[in-house]
Amino acid sequence: MAGNDGTLAVVHEPEHSRFAVHAEGRTAVLDYQRVGERLVLPHTGVPRELEGRGIGNQLAKATLDWAREEGLRVVPICPFVRAYLQRHPEYADLLTRAEPS
């Protein structure tokens, strides 16, 4: 289902530990693992048929907004999410800090 601005709806599927977009019989996902007060983001997957529509960006934004609402720190393992965070410094406060050595 598309919104008024043409974006597809992102749904939170906590039973599967992911955010998802369902379109054209396909599913794009951003998986997460909640570990205490941290949200580990290991994988984003967008089917080839859905690429080029900004769906990965929508998934990243929804996931990071949810992490902020929940007061979680983010551990971005997924290269796509890491690149998204570099392009969107407004989420820098969500990143975990390195442990002191």
Map each language-model feature to its residues:
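C-terminal structural segments of small proteins and small subunits
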Residues: W66-S101
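A short, internal acetyl-CoA/4′-phosphopantetheine-binding micro-motif in the GNAT/acyltransferase core
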Residues: G45-E51
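N-terminal first-folded block
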Residues: A2-T44
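Conserved acetyl-CoA-binding loop-helix of GNAT-fold acetyltransferases
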Residues: G52-T63
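Short capping/connector residues at structural and topological boundaries
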Residues: E15, E51, T96-P100
